[in-house]
From Swiss-Prot:
Annotated source species: Pseudomonas aeruginosa (strain ATCC 15692 / DSM 22644 / CIP 104116 / JCM 14847 / LMG 12228 / 1C / PRS 101 / PAO1)
EC code: 2.1.1.185
Enzyme class: transferase
Pfam families noted in UniProt: SpoU_methylase (PF00588), SpoU_sub_bind (PF08032)
Protein name: 23S rRNA (guanosine-2'-O-)-methyltransferase RlmB
Length: 248
């Protein structure tokens, strides 16, 4: 499987089969697994004439980098968008633009969780710096539960410069910082927005911070001083979604 990427887990593989079936070369299932969730996968694979085989679970354990749920797919290399594609993504997106920029999130579990939350909140693209980010690997895909197959991940050479270009296009850049004067709930986030989240502990880099139009913090009522970056991202994104959702 060395020349192919591997994707594992029911949700991640199902998302691939539904959204990018041409990328899937082979579907492997653990011997003896015939439950309804696997039946859905085999039916999808059959519809696209994708071979389905069985392997001993211990062999799948060696292939996968984590809990595979008895499902592993061999796929062609994943697409990471370049910064020149941001304009196209914004042009074809519907509604008020909402982008997420992750400055220095290097843990694949955090990146996967952020992708999952971003998709749920309606984010059009997630932006990461090429040299300060986890890569789109099998662990990220598994944690993202299918979101990595549908939400564009844009890797940029210079995050500060990219934020400046987005500002010129009319987007407001909102960065998160624990020492900010205002809380996130005091900002009007209904307009075109880029939400910037920094790395745990270090926060945003200096140049990234300098390119933010606003800085905001999450109010903390307990004894801990901060949240996990993926949890904080979820809180921030769903506050933006709340502000943009009309009351019925």
């Amino acid at each position: 499987m060395s020349q192919w990427e591997k994707v594992y887990g029911v949700h991640a593989v199902e998302a691939l089969l539904r959204h990018h079936p041409k990328r899937v070369k082979q579907l492997w299932l653990a011997e003896g697994r015939h439950d309804p969730r696997v039946q859905v996968l085999t039916e999808l694979a059959a519809g696209f004439r994708i071979p389905v085989g069985q392997r001993d679970r211990r062999e799948l354990d060696e292939w996968a980098e984590g809990v595979h749920q008895g499902v592993v797919a061999e796929v062609s290399p994943s697409q990471v968008w370049g910064e020149n594609m941001l304009e196209e993504l914004l042009e074809r997106s519907e509604g008020v633009p909402l982008l997420l920029a992750l400055d220095g999130v290097t843990d694949p579990h955090n990146l996967g969780a952020c992708l999952r939350t971003a998709d749920a909140a309606g984010v059009q693209a997630v932006i990461v710096p090429k040299d300060k980010s986890a890569t789109l690997n099998a662990t990220v895909r598994k944690v993202a539960c299918g979101a990595a197959e549908v939400i564009p991940l844009v890797a940029v050479t210079n995050l500060a410069r990219t934020l400046e270009k987005l500002q010129q296009r009319g987007l407001w850049v909102v960065g998160t910082a624990g020492e900010a004067d205002k809380t996130l709930y005091q900002l009007d986030l209904k307009g075109p927005t880029v939400l910037v989240m920094g790395a745990e502990g270090k926060g945003m880099r200096r140049l990234t911070r300098e390119h933010c139009d606003f800085l905001a913090r999450l109010p903390m009522a307990g004894s801990v001083s901060s949240l996990n970056v993926s949890v904080a991202t979820g809180v921030c994104l769903f506050e933006i979604l709340r502000q943009r959702t009309p009351l019925e």
